[in-house]
């Protein structure tokens, strides 16, 4: 089972029945981080991606990689933008049509402009939680396009170019859900997608740690060593 609760890293937990989603037999013994997988499904729904659209995903961590696969399967042409070469390789494996190294602000804009014949992107998903990639994501969004904020911004206020957002007529979507029922809905959608083979997150689980080495797992999540995408902790 997967559940919403506030007791991470515990061997046992107690949760409301409405916050628990039963896993099918096909997922027995397989890691299934319900909250982030459900989060990806909810972001996809909020993004409103349509077949034939060009979608830029800024930041290819676990969430960005999942969204690359989901957006590709929705019929979009995905341009993945990430700092690490390893992450760009993951994005290609998850279906990205194009990859761009996240190194220089103006070079990235020029690259995406060229890849889209000057039209930029109908949908841009920012999945880093940092100021510069948020600025970059806005630059890559086409007129009347949709800027989807999926990154978790937690290190202080953000400044945005409101004149640019206004001039381009952007729809700006905060894709974070706070209603527990929406969380559970996303987790149910994720369970179905993985069980039916429409989404395979297994290649993204690059590291595993026992609970006794939780400190190492958290350090890896912070430092992102070469080859790291997602760690799971087992009792």
Describe the residue ranges of each PLM region.
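Glycine/charged-rich beta-loop-alpha catalytic/anionic-binding loops adjacent to active sites
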Residues: 19-29, 53, 119, 171
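Glycine-rich phosphate/adenylate-binding loop and adjacent beta-alpha elements
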Residues: 1-21
């Amino acid at each position: 089972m997967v559940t919403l609760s506030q007791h991470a890293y515990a061997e046992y937990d107690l949760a409301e029945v409405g916050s628990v989603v039963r896993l099918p037999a096909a997922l027995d013994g397989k890691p299934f981080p319900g909250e982030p997988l459900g989060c990806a499904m909810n972001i996809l729904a909020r993004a409103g991606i349509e077949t034939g659209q060009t979608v830029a995903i800024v930041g290819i961590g676990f969430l960005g990689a999942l969204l690359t696969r989901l957006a590709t399967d929705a019929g979009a042409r995905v341009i993945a933008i990430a700092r690490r070469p390893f992450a760009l390789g993951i994005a290609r494996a998850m279906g990205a049509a194009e990859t761009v190294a996240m190194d220089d602000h103006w070079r990235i804009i020029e690259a995406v402009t060229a890849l889209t014949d000057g039209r930029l992107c109908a949908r841009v998903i920012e999945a880093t939680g940092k100021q510069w990639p948020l600025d970059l994501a806005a630059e890559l969004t086409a007129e009347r396009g949709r800027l989807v904020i999926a990154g978790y911004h937690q290190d202080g206020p953000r400044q945005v170019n409101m004149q640019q957002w206004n001039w381009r007529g952007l729809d700006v979507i905060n894709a974070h859900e706070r209603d527990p029922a929406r969380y559970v809905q996303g987790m149910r959608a994720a369970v179905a997608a993985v069980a039916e083979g429409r989404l395979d997150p297994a290649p993204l689980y690059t590291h595993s740690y026992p609970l006794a080495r939780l400190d190492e797992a958290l350090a890896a999540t912070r430092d992102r060593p070469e080859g790291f995408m997602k760690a799971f902790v087992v009792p």
